[in-house]
Amino acid sequence: MKIIKTADYNEMSKVAANIIAAQITLKPNSVLGLATGSSPIGTYKELISKYENGEIDFSDITTVNLDEYKGMPRTNEQSYYYFMNDNLFDHVNIDKNRTHVPNGMAEDAELECKEYEKLVKSVGGVDLQLLGLGRNGHIGFNEPSEEFAKETHCVDLTESTIEANKRFFASADDVPRQAFSMGIGTIMAAKKIVVVVSGADKAEAVKKAFTGPVTPNVPGSILQFHGDVTVVCDAEAYAELEK
């Protein structure tokens, strides 16, 4: 595991975007695993800039997203489908038919999980997976629990995750209580993983996940067992590692 300390959010975003741009350049038909939330927005802005400057080409890229709120229609601005279009897909030359996000409105949750897992395998698996890290150490919507969930599954969101996500909604009551998420096994099957983490409120999670014991109570800690992980932190998120 390689942990890179950067000065601030902007530098963190640039470093992460450079790693992804290199992947696209070296393998133009890469499968990218993508994340949502505030952490990767800057990375996506940098990728859009690189595309506009003619540095990278998304025309042969396939994407699979980590997660989606259960019961959230794709037209809702808080859906991760909407987020991805708004923050990346609408601004680059990607084929929308090759962008995949779990269907939050699927009537059969169990079937949707199985189908999404099949989809990830059918595109050849993930070449590079972009992740954020939750305050409670979650990756995707894999919350702290008794065991690591292996495959795509439907998960109950913890109070801390609902609290963290309520800033995107009118109130905490509007935050969905469940989500579809790639499992830890699905994430770990990616050939390369890049984690972006920023802010002082993530510093404790960084320390626990990347220097503490590997435990399902801190889902991100499993990344210590992956052979090719780069964690890109801003100075605030890195702070606990310097103590």
Model-derived regions: residue spans:
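N-terminal active-site beta-alpha-beta segment that forms phosphate/nucleotide-binding
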Residues: 2-115, 119-122
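Conserved phosphate- and dinucleotide-binding cores of soluble alpha/beta proteins
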Residues: 4, 72-78, 82-86, 90-243
